[in-house]
A protein has these predicted regions:
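Conserved N-terminal segment of class I S-adenosyl-L-methionine
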Residues: 2-235, 256, 271-320
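A conserved beta-strand element that flanks and buttresses the S-adenosyl-L-methionine
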Residues: 241
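A short glycine-rich, Lys/Arg-flanked "PGG" loop and its adjoining helix->strand segment in the class I
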Residues: 254-268
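Hydrophobic adenine-recognition pocket in adenosine-nucleotide-binding enzymes
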Residues: 245
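Di-metal (Zn2+ and/or Mg2+/Mn2+) metal-binding site signature of metallo-dependent hydrolases
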Residues: 248, 252
């Protein structure tokens, strides 16, 4: 974890408690964090070290050890990192082991259930939907997914063998930044530069804390004031990652067109597009514009991995190259 900690990096809301009803003004917390200086000192790995870590993790996944070791508390790094964030930044009460983590995750998940339609009428409303205190559950969920290597497909060479050394990579709508996390652990010998971009939500705050001092990373927070121009002057990416994002966007066609325009010719475009019911945090406009968005993508890329033949169904993990 980054060395940046402190309760001043978390702006509390009134009410609740510091255990199973912690209430955070997450946008103000992001703005407070963005004012902090960065001391970029994280060391990057070497190839041989990354090689051994990668193959050990691959073997652990294949043998079914990853999940059991994490769930039983034998693999503890993920839990210690989360606990440091929970205690030293969010000011939560001490977690006594992995059982406390799961008990709390269950409590926050119950609060997070959406039983009524959400208001998507403006950028401000869009952000507020993701910033409700109950959405703290998403940090628990993403931390656990990271620990269990649920996105274990990220360990496969089909992605990283295609990424050039010294690439500039955008992980858009990154949440806890699973692609950067994988790169940091296993592929940092590629010496890439990263831009992690998302709205000021709960998992992205944890991602910033984790990677604040990493020299390979820049953070791009999409507030209401830059909602219509989310990338600013950032351009010339070698890789753009848009995973588990499109179904949540209010303007998926605009965002996709923007991202493709900032991707170099020959660059990699990694994406998927779930066909959801447009409930909860899945945006109704994104469901209505699926075919138009997918047609835009297909018209500008060559699909290297994945299947986009059935536009009426969910589109799974795809790797494409911009034409």
């Amino acid at each position: 974890m980054s060395k940046i900690v402190g309760h001043e990096l978390c702006v509390p809301l009134e009410g609740g408690n510091l255990y199973d009803d912690l209430r955070v003004d997450i946008e103000s917390s992001h703005r407070q964090l963005d004012r902090e200086p960065r001391i970029q000192n994280q060391r990057q790995g070497i190839w041989i070290g990354n090689f051994f870590k990668l193959n050990f993790s691959r073997a652990s996944v294949l043998l079914g050890l990853t999940e059991s070791l994490a769930l039983n508390g034998f693999r503890r790094k993920w839990l210690l990192e989360f606990h440091a964030y929970w205690r030293l930044v969010l000011n939560g009460r001490t977690l006594w082991g992995v059982s406390n983590f799961f008990a709390l995750a269950h409590e926050y998940r119950k609060k997070q259930q959406h039983v009524e339609g959400l208001n998507w009428g403006s950028p401000s409303a869009h952000l507020k939907n993701w910033q409700h205190p109950s959405e703290l559950y998403s940090t628990f969920r993403m931390a656990l997914k990271d620990a269990l290597l649920i996105k274990r497909g990220l360990l496969l060479p089909r992605i990283w063998n295609k990424v050039p050394r010294h690439a500039k990579i955008l992980e858009y709508g990154c949440s806890l930044a699973p692609y950067y996390s994988t790169y940091r652990q296993y592929f940092s010998h590629l010496r890439c530069r990263w831009v992690l971009a998302d709205i000021p939500n709960f998992p992205f705050h944890y991602a910033k804390i984790r990677y604040w001092n990493d020299p390979a990373v820049e953070f791009l927070t999409i507030y209401e004031e830059n909602f219509q121009n989310p990338l600013g002057g950032e351009r010339d990416f070698d890789v753009v990652i848009l995973k588990e994002v499109l179904e949540h966007l209010d303007e998926p066609l605009f965002v996709t067109e923007l991202l493709l325009s900032r991707l170099k010719t020959g660059g990699l475009f990694i994406f998927d597009y779930e066909k959801s019911d447009a409930l909860g945090l899945d945006h109704p406009k994104s469901l209505g514009m699926r075919k138009e968005v997918l047609a835009l993508i297909i018209g500008q890329v060559e699909i290297l991995h994945g299947d986009v033949s059935d536009l009426d169904s969910s589109i799974g993990f795809c790797i494409a190259r911009k034409l």
